[in-house]
Design a protein with these regions (language model features):
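Cys-dependent protein tyrosine phosphatase-like superfamily
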Residues: 1-148, 161-260
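Ser/Thr-glycine-rich phosphate-binding loops at phosphate-binding pockets of nucleotides
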Residues: 153, 157-158
């Protein structure tokens, strides 16, 4: 099944996770779990669409620095929760071209290894593990209405959050992977704009290659997270139960709330 893209013009990568089938024959409910990029500077149209769509909660996965730089638009009738997946110093989102240039101007594949390492860190850091747990708990505390969970581009921190909730709901790994990779299609225009800006600034081809890698998802990034869970924590199920402290009761509640 193809991803359900929301008709929002001022939000990057907006999708409803509803409609995905689970391995035991259930379906993820529509208008419940929405994954997006940042939601600053929303148009009135997009705000009203989300209100009409039943939005009740917004979970901001970004760092405090990012939130201050590009604060969420406060949407009428919704509650906002700040749950940072990454510490302040572990995301390139919101970083200036000048600072990125210092890091990624020479080696055209530096960003690839940087992203793989970021995914490993999101799995191994206690900070991130606690944050994923809090997000899942907040989902379990939402008996009705829609939740937006978002980072900056809606692909990495949001991508792993989506991985965990869909896996817990019983969606198969290949479907989860295809949903994750769909961010590349959704962010094509965004990457093109960034590349043009870098070109106009006279940036090197190596830097522009790295910029595209930073604005993309890849099988290898997600695989590094999965491999880390399997090799260091005994598997995905073990990781979710032990490192994310997700109980059988929490799993049952999430499935009750988000499946039909």
């Amino acid at each position: 099944m193809q991803a359900k893209v929301l008709p929002l013009k001022t939000i990057r990568n907006p999708r409803d996770l509803g409609g995905y089938l689970t391995q035991d024959g259930h379906k993820v409910k529509m208008q419940r779990l929405l994954r997006t990029g940042r939601i600053c500077n929303l148009s009135r149209h997009d705000q009203q669409y989300l209100i009409n769509y039943g939005l009740r909660k917004v979970i901001d996965l970004r760092s405090e620095k990012e939130r201050k730089q590009d604060p969420d638009t406060l949407i009428s009738g919704t509650k906002h929760f700040n749950i940072s997946i990454s510490p302040e110093d572990n995301t390139e989102a919101g970083t200036s071209f000048e600072d990125l240039f210092k890091k990624f101007d020479a080696n055209p594949t530096a960003a690839f290894e940087h992203m793989r390492e970021n995914y490993r860190l999101m799995i191994t850091r206690p900070h991130s593990q606690r944050a994923f747990h809090r997000v899942l708990e907040e989902m379990a505390n939402t008996p009705e209405g829609a939740i937006i969970f978002h980072c900056s581009e809606g692909k990495d921190r949001t991508g792993l959050t989506t991985f965990f909730i869909l896996y817990i709901l019983g969606v198969d790994l290949e479907t989860i992977r295809q949903d994750y990779l769909f961010s590349n299609y959704m962010l094509n225009d965004y990457r093109a704009r960034r590349d043009l800006e870098a070109k106009e600034k006279g940036s090197s081809l190596a830097f522009r290659a790295n910029l595209r890698l930073l604005g993309s998802v890849a099988d290898e990034y997600l695989d590094n997270a999965i491999i880390t869970m399997c090799e260091e924590y005994g598997g995905i199920d073990s990781y979710i139960k032990k490192q994310l402290a997700v109980s059988d009761e929490l799993i049952d509640l999430l499935r009750k709330l988000y499946l039909e």
